[in-house]
Amino acid sequence: ESDFARKVHPIREYFNALPLLNPAEHGHIGRLLNTVQVANPGKWEEYFTKWLIGVVANAMNDTGCQNHTCLVLTGDRQGQFKSWWLDNLCPTPLKNYLFTGKIDPQGKDILTLIAEYLFINIDDQLKELNKQNENALKNLITTPAVKYRRPYDIYIEEYPHLASFMASVNGNEFLTD
């Protein structure tokens, strides 16, 4: 750490710069929820709101908060804009902190994503996971911190869990337990 440069956290700075709004007065979450067709709107509102609060709590607190859920959009077929909708949850100024694609739950790169990104959008991969990778993914979603060595660093260090997970999948048959 440098004594000459202050530590910056662009995600926290973004959230801190937002105006405070009364949710009951503005209804932004409700309007967003209405852009997705679901079988049970009440559960959708409850689970999405909890997940979204978890996203902000994760971003604003290094300890004590981990978003232990993965928001998953399902649909009967491709081309229903599931991944697009999820990607657009990330505000434009924070697009550099959004990862969309396939991950290796047992690889080292995912640790960097968890520590440095706001969102990890697992795109059309949930059905492909074997039991070992499925368990590894569950562990990654719920871990409070990750340990790894950054490129050119000498030592392994611990970093708080920043990222919140989301995913899209075709069909509903992806949970095995």
Task: Give the residues covered by each predicted segment.
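Short, conserved, surface-exposed binding loops centered on an aromatic residue
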Residues: 63-64, 158, 175-177
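AAA+/SF3 P-loop NTPase mechanochemical coupling elements
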Residues: 110-115, 150-168
